[in-house]
């Protein structure tokens, strides 16, 4: 099976060729693996990556409200049983502040615009550097991330590493 899969170098080459072709046809990359013509970006995806609360309705749906994750059952019988008791979901899990920070970072770094240091402070009451300073510095030294003004984001090499690492 492995001989059927492209090498990591070939994956990066295909990724960069795809990006070049899409750019030539007017598509912009707004997330590490999503392209759209300006104004046609997925609002759902951008909301998810921006850590905006959302409500999922129906079988196997998930929601994120008030820093909690909610999940509906994937089995129809279980779903109908829960609904008959007046419950709207199977389980809820509150995220710790650290888990919220982690999600803010890894979801936000998927966007080509990256993440705002100011927004991190407003959301969590501490600086991004105080929590992730060592990792940020090391990633920047390795050329995987960069900082411009208030924003931190992945470089092209950082995107390729993330894209090829099954992250």
Question: What are the functions of these language-model segments?
Answer:
Residues 1-126:
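C-terminal scaffold of the Radical SAM
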Residues 23, 140-141:
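Alpha-helix C-terminal capping/helix-coil junction sites
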Residues 36-39, 137, 155-156:
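Short secondary-structure capping/turn micro-motifs that flank functional sites
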Residues 41-45, 142-143, 160:
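Short secondary-structure transition/capping segments
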Residues 127-138:
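Short amphipathic alpha-helical interaction segments
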Residues 141-149:
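A short, conserved structural fragment
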Residues 150-159:
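Accessory beta->alpha helical hairpin/"wing" motif in late/C-terminal subdomains of nucleic-acid enzymes
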Residues 163-167:
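Conserved small/polar residues in nucleotide/adenosyl-binding loops
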């Amino acid at each position: 099976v492995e001989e059927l899969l492209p090498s990591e170098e070939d994956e990066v080459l295909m990724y960069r060729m795809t990006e070049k072709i899409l750019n030539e046809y007017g598509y912009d990359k707004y997330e590490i693996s999503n392209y759209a013509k300006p104004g046609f970006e997925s609002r759902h995806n951008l909301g998810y990556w921006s850590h905006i609360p959302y409500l999922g309705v129906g079988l196997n749906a998930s929601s994120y409200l008030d820093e909690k994750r909610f999940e509906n059952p994937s089995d129809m019988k279980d779903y109908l049983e829960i609904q008959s008791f007046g419950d709207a979901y199977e389980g809820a899990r509150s995220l710790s502040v650290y888990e919220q920070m982690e999600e803010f970072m890894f979801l936000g770094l998927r966007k080509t615009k990256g993440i705002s240091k100011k927004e991190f402070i407003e959301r969590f009451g501490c600086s991004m550097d105080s929590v992730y300073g060592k990792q940020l510095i090391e990633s920047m030294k390795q050329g995987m991330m960069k900082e411009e003004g208030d924003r931190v984001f992945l470089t092209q090499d950082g995107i390729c590493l993330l894209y090829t690492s099954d992250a």
